[in-house]
A protein has these predicted regions:
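Residue "hotspots" at secondary-structure boundaries inside conserved domains
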Residues: 66, 72, 119-121, 224, ...
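Catalytic-pocket segment enriched in acidic/His residues
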Residues: 48, 55-58, 83, 159-293
């Protein structure tokens, strides 16, 4: 099942089920608009029954929004061997996580802002895990039971701000620098999350091309590790790392970073495309509250 958050023309944010080129509109029924919460509170089978008599609209007639509204957005660094090599670093012995502030989240088609304070803007294609159950101390073998599904992420990074801080959070958390989408694919439909092709294009230039099977720490290990420290909640997002090919890993670096007008396309097998375009940061921009993004 592919679940989305969307806003029909002139309408409020609603939950939808994507089927081909249509959205099954679940706004007439009393279900959460957030996919992970709907799966947790209503259940997938009940959503399928509700969809049988729900109205439909075309994908092109709705604005797709980020398919998760996380309380916590976490990312892992240095989780593909080829990316570790291109950065000239050594593989970590334990997962290295950082926070992305949730006000960075935007959906498919939204603009990525070139900050007024930097032009060292970079892309990172990533598979994102969306948590589906409130959980703590999850064994690796039980991690699939607490995952609602998966989506595509672009862990947009401001490299100079990232590099001069003791933690990566500030360089990873600028407003609009957390695109997610286009929808959440439930775990049962996606299958093995460690056997997916992941690619990133800047305009039509292929920059990243790898398999999620190349992760150092797989999705289930990441969920388990984080849950040892703190409670994970439905809708929380874990960006599971990026492969080689990021702009800062290419020469000349300046030419391979993002520029105003560039369109970034993250493609993940079994999920789809997440497309966003870089624009100048608008004067006076303030991020919307998360449910509206």
């Amino acid at each position: 099942m592919k679940l989305c958050r969307f806003a029909p023309a002139g309408g409020a944010v609603a939950l939808g089920i994507v089927e081909g080129e249509e959205i099954v509109d679940l706004s007439p029924v009393d279900v959460p608009a957030e996919p992970a919460a709907a799966l947790d509170e209503v259940g997938q089978e009940a959503l399928e029954r509700l969809a049988e008599r729900a109205p439909r609209l075309g994908l092109s007639d709705a604005q797709l929004l980020a398919p998760a509204t996380p309380h916590k957005y976490l990312g892992i660094a240095l989780n593909y061997a080829d990316h570790i090599a291109e950065m000239g670093m050594e593989a970590p012995e334990v997962p290295v996580f950082f926070n992305k502030q949730v006000t960075c989240v935007v959906g498919p088609g939204a603009d990525i802002h070139m900050p007024r304070v930097s032009t060292f803007l970079d892309y990172e294609a990533e598979l994102a895990v969306v948590i589906g159950k409130r959980c703590r101390h999850v064994p690796v073998e039980q991690a699939p039971e607490v995952i609602a599904g998966y989506t595509a992420a672009n862990d947009v990074s401001v490299r100079d701000w990232q590099g001069r801080a003791q933690t990566m959070t500030i360089g990873k958390s600028f407003d609009t620098h957390g695109p997610l989408g286009p929808w959440l694919v439930t775990a049962d439909e996606l299958g093995d999350p460690q056997d997916l092709r992941i690619r990133c294009f800047v305009d039509d230039d292929l920059r990243q091309d790898a398999s999620t099977g190349e992760m150092v720490f797989d999705c289930f290990q990441q969920v388990s590790h984080l849950s040892e420290a703190f409670t994970l909640e439905p809708g929380d997002v874990i960006a599971t790392g990026t492969p080689a090919g990021v702009g800062i890993g290419r020469q000349p670096i300046r030419d391979n970073l993002l520029h105003v007008g560039d369109t970034v396309r993250v493609e993940i097998e079994g999920i789809g495309e997440l497309v966003n375009t870089v624009v100048e940061e608008p004067e006076g921009f303030v991020a919307q509250s998360l449910p509206a993004c």
